Amino acid sequence: VKSTGRADDDLAVKTKYLPP
């Protein structure tokens, strides 16, 4: 997980790795 400093990116990454 890259630290972009944006919560939206972090959330997007989690939703990508985790099943819907």
Curated annotation (Swiss-Prot):
One of its GO terms (biological process) is killing of cells of another organism. Keywords: Antimicrobial, Fungicide. Residues 1-13 have a biased composition (Basic and acidic residues). Residues 1-20 are annotated as: Disordered. Has antifungal activity against B.cinerea, M.arachidicola and P.piricola. Inhibits HIV-1 reverse transcriptase. This is Cicerarin.
